[in-house]
Amino acid sequence: MNWVEKYRPKTMSEIVGNNKIKEELKNWIEEILHNEIPKPVLLVGPPGCGKTTLTNALANDYGFELIELNASDKRNKDIIRQIVGGASSSKSITGKRVLIVLDEVDGLSGNSDRGGVSEIIKIIKNAKNPIILTANDIYKPSLMSLRTVCNIVKIGSVHTNSIVPVLRRISLKEGFEVDDKILKIIAKHAGGDVRSAINDLESLAMGNTFDEDNVRELPDRDTDKSIFDAIRIIFKTTHYDISLEATRDLKEDIGTVQEWIAENVPREYKKGKEICLAYDNLSKADIFLGRVYKRQYYGLWRYASALMSAGVSLAKDEKYRGFFSYMRPTIFTKMSRSKGKRGAVNKVLEKISLKSHVSKRRAREDILYLEYILKNDAEMGAKLCEFYEFTKEDIEYLTNKTIAKKIIKLMKGDDKKTNNKKGKENKTKNTTKKIKEIKETPKKEEVKEPKKQIEKQKSEKKEPKKQMTLESFF
């Protein structure tokens, strides 16, 4: 069981925050128990703020049986009259009072929901059982007439500080000790959506990647909300047109939507033949996408879209009731975790490509042989690493820290020998150069002095020097 469903609050007392709203709903339901008929409640708030959880907990606390009609169902005039009309004034088979929930009434639009709003208003006027409507956007034009006949209760986003304790409690129960700093980042990233925060926590726990870098790589939450709503409709509905419409307005590329659906098929469908048929339609959608890119003919796009949405919706025999937590594709998490590794291999390939004068694609073919040499012949590996100018990080990526240390040591030893050899060569060269300079220097010619001057110098040498005495000064 997914964590959102596993740890979903069953009673009002278990729900975090929104104390004022909980009290308001309790007072409203108690009025009904005292045979008063107050206006229906229109719960308005962003996805994940707890609208569904509040209605379920309220029904559990007061022993009401829930009858739900949500966005994955056709909700035109006839269907609403058939399902909701009778339930609005009678008890269930078990004799319990009935609580009717019309989910996401702001999504009532198009031909499939024609006349739905007007029929809801008619039922509200004659209802004897409590009715709760939920919506994400109260200001949609389609809700103008509903706003006048309902008691509007606005639910805000849950504060980050209220989400952190929930995440801490779940992680401890699942046997994970996660730092509060990480939990706060997850909670803050969820933007007040408790359901999304729990989904992110479960996704990170599956890969055991509770480090700050991976947490910050989580996708934008606004994007998740739109995809989450779309795939929920695809998995819940059994109508071709509703399923096809669910993906029509998504901003995400079709490949991303396909990954989301593929990831969550086994979470929703339980029968082997349903899972098999759903994946078969997804694989056919993938073939059409391949043809789109190969032939640049985008007319095939609609077939891929129909197969991955309606094809998956119609793969089941019947609709699965209950709420399922849909997970973001694990491939996104794996890509995030391998980001550093992919960067490292790219650097290595660039260096091999540059030195060997080949493409990176061709260099990739040789990388396995290079790894083998480095792991089994350290001396040869050291020479290759010097040639390719690999850094410590490059060598560690290709081998491991122990082998990398050995190779780096050999590389340093070779550098020392090379430096000593170069030093000796330079010394020899300098000596040779000096000798050569001496040999090539021309001798200075002696200047011949006149004979008389020479004789005079000789006579001066022969005469004894006079001894200096005290008398010589007088």
Curated annotation (Swiss-Prot):
Matching InterPro entries, A to Z? AAA+_ATPase (IPR003593), ATPase_AAA_core (IPR003959), P-loop_NTPase (IPR027417), Rep_factor-C_lsu (IPR023935), RFC_lid (IPR047854)
Quaternary form? Heteromultimer composed of small subunits (RfcS) and large subunits (RfcL).
Organism expressing this protein natively: Methanococcus aeolicus (strain ATCC BAA-1280 / DSM 17508 / OCM 812 / Nankai-3)
Note down the stretches annotated as region Disordered: 415-474
Q: What is the recorded name of this protein?
A: Replication factor C large subunit
Q: Which stretches are tagged as biased composition: Basic and acidic residues?
A: 415-468
Listed under GO biological process in this entry are: DNA replication
- One Pfam family here: RCF1-5-like_lid
Q: What are the record keywords, sorted?
A: ATP-binding, DNA replication, Nucleotide-binding
* Chain positions recorded as ATP binding sites: 45-52
Q: Which family does it belong to?
A: Belongs to the activator 1 small subunits family. RfcL subfamily.
